Amino acid sequence: MWEQRRQKVVFSLTILVRYRLKQSMAKKISKNSRAARQSDALEPEVKDLSELPRAEKTDLTNILIRTAAKNEALLEAKISKKANKSKRGKKLNKKALEDKLANSISSMDRDRLVKALNFTNRLDGKIAKSISRAKYIQNTRKAGWDSTNETIKKELAFLNGGLSVQAKSASEGNAEKEDEEIPEVFDSLAEDNTVQKTPTNRFGVLPDDVEE
């Protein structure tokens, strides 16, 4: 029984292989063959239709409408982007805040604007202080030690109220007196030196012995 089944399977496989070989070895119908010429003669319209160009859409209204809408949307997006950039780049000045405060209606907006105005005032003061500090540091770095010391002394004098006119005159008088006293001291020292240098007779101290 198994042998019969095996023989049937082998037989069917051989038939299938032969059929495939026939198909592969079969010649293709050439254009110049009788069958090809007969088919062309029977169906001339098919050849004409195959040679015709492909039909194209002539109605372009839909495409134009879409492109116009797209361009309009892009233009609006560009304009809104520029407006947002300009709003972000603008700084709120004191005058602009005051005008907005005057035109504000609700109390909440008024309170917010008052806070913003106070903040801008403080910020302006801080900016001015930082600018002056930066200039002072640059000048001190460029200048020498003598000029920096002089500027520090002037600033300290200005902070302490400055030197009074009487103090200045007293200091000038003391300086003049010191200048006058210096040559007198030198003269007295010179006289002392001359006195010390004069020779003294040591035998003059002894008593005179008179012979009688």
From Swiss-Prot:
Residues 28-48, 188-212 are annotated as: Disordered. Keywords: Cytoplasm, Nucleus, Phosphoprotein, Ribosome biogenesis, Transport. InterPro entries: Pre-60S_factor_ECM1, Ribosome_bgen_Alb1. It is found in: Nucleus, Nucleolus; Nucleus; Cytoplasm. Pfam families: Alb1. GO terms for biological process: ribosomal large subunit export from nucleus. The modification Phosphoserine is found at S188. It comes from the Eukaryota. Belongs to the ECM1 family. Pre-ribosomal factor involved in 60S ribosomal protein subunit export from the nucleus. Associates with the pre-60S ribosomal particle and the nucleopore complex. Present with 2840 molecules/cell in log phase SD medium. This is Shuttling pre-60S factor ECM1.
